[in-house]
Amino acid sequence: MAKVIQLSDELSNKIAAGEVVERPASVVKELVENAIDADSTVIEIDIEEAGLASIRVLDNGEGMENEDCKRAFRRHATSKIKDENDLFRVRTLGFRGEALPSIASVSHLEITTSTGEGAGTKLVLQGGNIISESRSSSRKGTEIVVSNLFFNTPARLKYMKTVHTELGNITDVVNRIALAHPEVSIRLRHHGKNLLQTNGNGDVRHVLAAIYGTAVAKKMLPLHVSSLDFEVKGYIALPEITRASRNYMSSVVNGRYIKNFPLVKAVHEGYHTLLPIGRHPITFIEITMDPILVDVNVHPSKLEVRLSKETELHDLIRDGIKDVFKQQQLIPSAQVPKKSAPAIKNEQQFITFDEKPPEKKVPEKSTAPSYSPMKLSSVVKEPVDAEEKLPPLQFDAPPIVDQEQTLEVSDVSAEQPETFEQECHEEQPQPASDRVPIMYPIGQMHGTYILAQNENGLYIIDQHAAQERIKYEYFREKVGEVEPEVQEMIVPLTFHYSTNEALIIEQHKQELESVGVFLESFGSNSYIVRCHPAWFPKGEEAELIEEIIQQVLDSKNIDIKKLREEAAIMMSCKGSIKANRHLRNDEIKALLDDLRSTSDPFTCPHGRPIIIHHSTYEMEKMFKRVM
């Protein structure tokens, strides 16, 4: 039998590095979080070959004294917790004392640090061992350069992705940290080219604009709700701004960005029926709570956390998002064709947010688009050479905002620059009926789209989607009735299933009855339906009952709330006006009046838009009546 031995510190650090340092992005995350814990206000990150060749992080934080600097590269050495009680009230981003020794054990590392009092310290390490020590300048702060990452762990290096993928991971990490800490000016460069720069003024809206662009930032709404245990703040994109993945949904708890599926689920439920299937919103959710309610000591990466009172937090976020959208008019405006301009790629863009814009004469202003929660004034200047546009890092003042990304040149001449604060003050809750303007029908297109107008322009309404929304809200109430009014069928319906399917149906008969499907056994693996709720769509009963049963058969876990929801959606779709159905004027007027009375009149239950708006100004611009 093999003997039990004590592993060396060098081997222990390599084992720990397997969890802490998964890829270059992990190194960047740990070093930047250390800089933030050191009260830095400016952080500069320089990357070569997506971090595999070199990672440099420079900050103006507190720095370290000579002995502390050497001690920091020993396992479980930290200045952030001192006893067991501190572990349950962690307020810093780091606390385990594993990051620096783990990074040093799989790389060549140089650190230069000073507290600003006397000479600083410079250490050079290879594979976790200090090979040289010297004095350095007394500039306050810390500079760490990590090179030849994974030089002594070729297996890990073998599984690195392409430069593009690894750089994307680094950018994602830095973006989320920048959102969590808008008070810190962060600059990220790859081979000398800026990928991100924030101004550190504490306004997360400027960070959102730097990451996603001003066009998206204009269409993000503020969120702020609280309870006795939680305060939730952030920004959520209007439903028209969606992405194909969840990567654009950021969650922060007590300044630490995390990955938590229940929080993602809460956000999606807040957007319920406003998003198309398979699409996800852009959101930034910042949660503040007592540290004792969150356990961050779950995994060395500290991305996963355990939250106490998770259900309460889930409901707070979901209901808060729903309340935000109840106050908005969510009719998207059609885009006016613009002169084609090439996208500007891989060049530095300077975006200025004017807090007090100068007075200027504005051309005739367009009718305000329906989606205008906040206004950003932006000036896109001509790109300049990298050497000119990237001044050396200054610690006495945060650098200006400049963002390298693909930007489309937008026509902003028709917008009067205003501050975020002015725009936010303009937001007022609107009664449900006032969110949809009064429109006067003028006809139909292909028996599918209703055309209506008012003083603000032309509205195009999808008649099927409109009635689908109306019927969905009706059926959603009906399907939850405890004792629905039933109607006997003249000719009962029979259904036949396999043995396995029949076992599932028997197990979930009660759930099926709760949505109006009343099954009686009718021989081996067969069922008969003799009645159904009176409000079932006429002529669609058999197909609807079969689809609801199939929904139960296809689901691994039956959620009665979700089953009722799906049933209401199916009923509304089957019972609504189909395409190529020509309506009379009075039918159109009744449909629009009913739509105005719904709680969410802007999207169908599947998340597709119901109304599109062409403003009078947009129409005139398309016909060149205005330039």
UniProtKB/Swiss-Prot annotation:
Gene Ontology molecular function: ATP binding; ATP hydrolysis activity; ATP-dependent DNA damage sensor activity; mismatched DNA binding
Biological process terms in GO annotation: mismatch repair
InterPro entries named among the record's database cross-references: DNA_mismatch_repair_CS, DNA_mismatch_repair_MutL, DNA_mismatch_S5_2-like, HATPase_C_sf, MutL/Mlh/PMS, MutL/Mlh/Pms-like, MutL_C, MutL_C_dimsub
PROSITE patterns: DNA_MISMATCH_REPAIR_1
One of the record's GO cellular component terms: mismatch repair complex
Biased composition (Basic and acidic residues): 354-364
Disruption phenotype: Double mutS-mutL deletion strain have 40-60 times greater spontaneous mutation rate. Cells lacking this gene have an 80-fold increased spontaneous mutation frequency. A double mutS/mutL and a triple mutS/mutL/nth disruption have a 200 to 280-fold increased spontaneous mutation frequency.
Region (Disordered): 354-374
Keywords: DNA damage, DNA repair
CDD domains for this protein: HATPase_MutL-MLH-PMS-like, MutL_Trans
Induction: Constitutively transcribed during vegetative growth, with a slight increase during stationary phase. Probably part of the mutS-mutL operon.
UniProt family annotation: Belongs to the DNA mismatch repair MutL/HexB family.
Job description of the protein: This protein is involved in the repair of mismatches in DNA. It is required for dam-dependent methyl-directed DNA mismatch repair. May act as a 'molecular matchmaker', a protein that promotes the formation of a stable complex between two or more DNA-binding proteins in an ATP-dependent manner without itself being part of a final effector complex. Overexpression of mutSL partially suppresses the high spontaneous mutation frequency of a ytkD/mutM/mutY triple disruption which lacks the system required to prevent damage by oxidized guanine (8-oxo-dGTP).
Protein name: DNA mismatch repair protein MutL
Organism whose genome encodes this protein: Bacillus subtilis (strain 168)
